[in-house]
Amino acid sequence: VMNNPEYMEVLKITSTPNSISTLTAAACTEMFKDNGYINESQSQIFTERNLIYSAMSTNKNVKLFKPYANYMLVKILKDDISANQIASQCNLKGIVIRNCENIRGLSNKYIRFCFMKPEQNDLLVNTILELL
C-alpha cells in the first residue's frame, strides 16, 4: 500500500491530520473526569495566555493570532529569521514549539506553541523576543 501513489493519495485525503494513539485517548478520557484538574488547568491557561499575548504584542516583528485555546499561532515578520531558527533555539533550552511550515496554507514564517507553566512560558517568550 505504501508504495502505491494512488493509495497514498487516498490515505492523505481521508486520514486525520493529527491522529492520537489509543493510550492517549484513554488518558484523555480519564483526565476529563477530574473537575478540579479541569478548572485549575483552565484558570492557568487563561492567565498564561493573557500574559504571553501582552508580552509579545508590543513586538513589531511578529503578528499574533489572538488565542482562544491552549496554544498560540505566531507569524514571524522579521525577514532574516525563520520558524526553524526559533524552534531550534527553543529546543536548545528544552522548550518544544511547532514549526508550521508543513501545514497547508502556512510557511516557514509561522510557529505554534502551547501555554505551559509560568517559568517555561517566561523562558519561551524571552527566547523568541531575543531572536527578534
Per-range role (PLM):
Residues 1-58, 62-65:
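PLP-dependent aminotransferase class I/II
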Residues 3, 16, 77-78, 116:
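Structured loop/turn residues at secondary-structure junctions
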Residues 11, 86, 124-127:
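Hydrophobic side chains in well-ordered alpha-helices
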Residues 15, 49, 98, 112-114:
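Short, cationic motifs built from Arg/Lys/His that form the positively charged side of catalytic pockets
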Residues 27, 72-73, 106-107:
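Short secondary-structure capping/turn micro-motifs that flank functional sites
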Residues 44, 55, 89, 127-130:
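Alpha-helical scaffold elements within enzyme catalytic domains, especially in hydrolases
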Residues 45-46, 50, 59-93, 115:
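Conserved PLP-binding catalytic core of the aspartate aminotransferase-like
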Residues 92-93, 102-132:
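PLP-dependent enzyme catalytic core of the Aspartate aminotransferase-like
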